[in-house]
Amino acid sequence: MAPADGESSPPPHVAVVAFPFSSHAAVLLSIARALAAAAAPSGATLSFLSTASSLAQLRKASSASAGHGLPGNLRFVEVPDGAPAAEESVPVPRQMQLFMEAAEAGGVKAWLEAARAAAGGARVTCVVGDAFVWPAADAAASAGAPWVPVWTAASCALLAHIRTDALREDVGDQAANRVDEPLISHPGLASYRVRDLPDGVVSGDFNYVINLLVHRMGQCLPRSAAAVALNTFPGLDPPDVTAALAEILPNCVPFGPYHLLLAEDDADTAAPADPHGCLAWLGRQPARGVAYVSFGTVACPRPDELRELAAGLEASGAPFLWSLREDSWTLLPPGFLDRAAGTGSGLVVPWAPQVAVLRHPSVGAFVTHAGWASVLEGVSSGVPMACRPFFGDQRMNARSVAHVWGFGAAFEGAMTSAGVAAAVEELLRGEEGARMRARAKVLQALVAEAFGPGGECRKNFDRFVEIVCRA
């Protein structure tokens, strides 16, 4: 409701709707914190909506990192997860299904009411949220507020999800027979093959919860989003991808990598938690001589592939830092951990401060699953990559790294010891690797320019703040 003549508009109240699984909520919280700081002069307040378990994890992470307390104008608001109270242990896919069913059945509307109550009755003026939670679009409309979704993955993957119906009509049931066919008839996707598409677009179980979710999201975004935040920066996406997205989503606002939004002295890169001594170990290694290995918190190679990877790292002769869940250590070759520790040639840890590790001058190669957050952290650190994708959008990301941007290599299928050794050797010391390293430095410079004073990502984030707060 517009204010009466002579009355001032109430300050903005932004509801931030999280997808409470994997790293999604943490990424959205980093944006919310930056938004809260930027919007404070307008008197804006933010309500961050997520489930009890998600908020508990975020609080734990915040307390473990210096400077990560919530701004005074940002509050947590707990929302139901949709799971029956009697069920103590629910598999994650089922948790996602229950959460989305609750969201679609009017849950988001109730969450916005909870945000209003937590804000002392201040109505929600804008709904920002993870694009995965597409039912927020209708809830925002019912509240008379715009919906501004945040996309956390690559632009090419978003384009594929939006064009899913057209891709399915084109490929039909022939995906297995057309895996190497380039998608030349689909604007923005000509650099990718059928095999590179995310799971559930033209192959896999279309009814799996995540595949259903992103399909509905892709249908919803073009008709309902007031603007869409993109996790990219000018100069990264090829012009055909940018043009194709702009035609479908005219109000795209790119200001990624999102982890760079917070000021340096406010981020954990200033004094990162490093309980396993990764940075001290790196300080004893040669410049650009270390291979850093991490597949994130979800993806993990099969036991035989883990052993091949370990053997390949040893065979490369390069020092390595490997972040690997401790429950997988028993799968490594006999004596591998002892040899690495005894010679000082390798360090295996259950967790590493990845951003700080990639920025360390001793790291010269990154062996990764090609999750988008990891790709952007590598790009912003100028580190070339060897990608072993597993699922989701990781195949598209790996294709981008190796064939679109040219600052790394991609394994086609499982890693072998010989393949790992060759990839690490090439990235660190090879002739082709030199070109990849140079390309990585070019992209790193583009990121630095975009986030520098007057840079395009800084300008775009200011525009995002204006869109969110003017409602």
Curated annotation (Swiss-Prot):
Catalytic reactions on record: an anthocyanidin + UDP-alpha-D-glucose + H(+) = an anthocyanidin 3-O-beta-D-glucoside + UDP
Function: In the presence of other necessary color factors, this glycosylation reaction allows the accumulation of anthocyanin pigments.
Pfam families: UDPGT
GO molecular function: anthocyanidin 3-O-glucosyltransferase activity
Active-site residue numbers: 24, 130
Residues annotated as binding an anthocyanidin: 24, 161, 392
Pathway where this protein functions: Pigment biosynthesis; anthocyanin biosynthesis
EC number per UniProt: 2.4.1.115
Protein name, per record: Anthocyanidin 3-O-glucosyltransferase
